[in-house]
């Protein structure tokens, strides 16, 4: 794998094999039996799938040393955000292309609540 060290590749392959084995050890439930029995089997299967998913995340963190939670993206305060188009009305890559946009009045169909 490009840009990775050999040791990291081995750890990644070990983690993938282990997670694949976990998922293969939990096949989907059989469609036989009463509706209630099928529902219970699906519910238990989904619970096991959730457990396998969380175990897989822990395996990835252990083998690859990644943080458990991603670093949150820092957004500016809402007070500083605006939708004012007066400073920069062009969109990137389209400035000067096509005809200039002319503001058009919206149709008067929705203005009155009575039919004519």
Swiss-Prot record:
Motif Nuclear export signal and binding to XPO1 per record, residues: 73-84
Keywords per UniProt: AIDS, Host cytoplasm, Host nucleus, Host-virus interaction, Methylation, mRNA transport, Phosphoprotein, RNA-binding, Transport
Disordered, as annotated region: 23-48, 90-116
One biological process term in Gene Ontology: mRNA transport
Region feature Homomultimerization, mapped onto this chain: 18-26
Tree of life domain: Viruses
Compartments it resides in: Host nucleus, Host nucleolus; Host cytoplasm
Modified residues (Phosphoserine): 5, 8, 92, 99
Biased composition (Basic residues): 36-48
Function according to Swiss-Prot or TrEMBL: Escorts unspliced or incompletely spliced viral pre-mRNAs (late transcripts) out of the nucleus of infected cells. These pre-mRNAs carry a recognition sequence called Rev responsive element (RRE) located in the env gene, that is not present in fully spliced viral mRNAs (early transcripts). This function is essential since most viral proteins are translated from unspliced or partially spliced pre-mRNAs which cannot exit the nucleus by the pathway used by fully processed cellular mRNAs. Rev itself is translated from a fully spliced mRNA that readily exits the nucleus.
Subunit organization: Homomultimer; when bound to the RRE. Multimeric assembly is essential for activity and may involve XPO1. Binds to human KPNB1, XPO1, TNPO1, RANBP5 and IPO7. Interacts with the viral Integrase. Interacts with human KHDRBS1. Interacts with human NAP1; this interaction decreases Rev multimerization and stimulates its activity. Interacts with human DEAD-box helicases DDX3 and DDX24; these interactions may serve for viral RNA export to the cytoplasm and packaging, respectively.
Protein name according to UniProt: Protein Rev
Originating species: Human immunodeficiency virus type 1 group M subtype D (isolate NDK)
Taxonomic path: Viruses, Riboviria, Pararnavirae, Artverviricota, Revtraviricetes
């Amino acid at each position: 794998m490009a840009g990775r060290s050999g040791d990291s590749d081995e750890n990644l392959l070990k983690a993938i094999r282990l997670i694949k084995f976990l998922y293969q050890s939990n096949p989907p439930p059989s469609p036989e039996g009463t509706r209630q029995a099928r529902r219970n089997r699906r519910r238990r299967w989904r619970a096991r799938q959730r457990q396998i998913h969380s175990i897989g995340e822990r395996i990835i963190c252990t083998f690859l040393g990644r943080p458990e939670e991603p670093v949150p993206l820092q957004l500016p305060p809402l007070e500083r955000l605006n939708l004012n188009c007066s400073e920069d009305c062009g969109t990137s890559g389209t400035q000067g292309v096509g005809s200039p946009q002319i503001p058009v009045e919206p149709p008067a169909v929705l203005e009155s609540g009575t039919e004519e």
